[in-house]
Amino acid sequence: MRTLKKRMAILLALTLMLFALGAAAGEDLPLIGIVQLVEHAALDAARDGFLDELKDQGYIDGQTIRVDYRNAQASPDILSSIADHFIGEEVDLVLAIATNSAQTMAGKTETIPILGTAITDYVVAKLAKSNEEPGYNVSGTTDMNPIEQQIALIRQMAPDTRSVGLLYTSSEDNSVTQARMARGFIEAAGMQYVEVTVNNANDVQQAAQSLVEQVDALYIPTDNIVASSMPIVHEAAVAKKIPIFCGEAGQILGGGTATLGISYYNLGRQTGQMAIDVLGGADISTMPIQSQTQFEYTINKTMCDLIGLEIPAELLPFAIEVP
């Protein structure tokens, strides 16, 4: 009996030792914190692309790296708490998805490397001194879209459009930048614009309903708050039978009409490769901001049918049914 108890004690000690060694090994793995402003198709795709690129290169959560993903639900207070959490955990790298995420994180640490994605203009957002050499602990990928071509798409699909409604969030630097550019391209195309901004998701319904009464088409940049509320905008536009032209494909899947934009999944993969470089010792302050150079049409045939908009023959190959 004593022999059995002794063997059991030895077995228990060995088990605890192996568990402790495993835990210690896990703690030695590089820790990547991911902070995402809000859930919507574009930001989710960027995150998926980032993680897939890491996985394909052998950086697997729980095996060769650790990943701590947090979503701020569009709340500045939650963003701040997430940043504090990552600093307390002494993460090795942060992926900040969307401008506000990167700004909050960068405002709290000058030492932890921060890679951004789904950010339009790092310099305007005061995240970098220049795109060529950021100069701070922040680099990443930009989601700047071909805005001039997107405005041209309005003319191509709805040639009788005389006025365009701009709907975006006033506190999102990325949206402000794109709206400023869009205003110039709209006027250059011989159209007028009407602008309504929102502060949060609660404002979207009233803003959308106001705009559709005044314009022939809507244009929405890659705006996170509005993107997360696309079904509301869709409902308002369908009621007045006007098209919604958007900054990215995720907004089309949410109820928009058409876009020519980047792939956020590919943007995330591009950011993942940058993360591998940073984990390998690259100096993030000298890593140029990267961008996508290929753009894709996405046309919502379901929406076009609802509002009676004919899709030009040359764009039919890009038309999809959206449930």
Each language-model region and where it sits:
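Bacterial N-terminal signal peptides
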Residues: 11-19
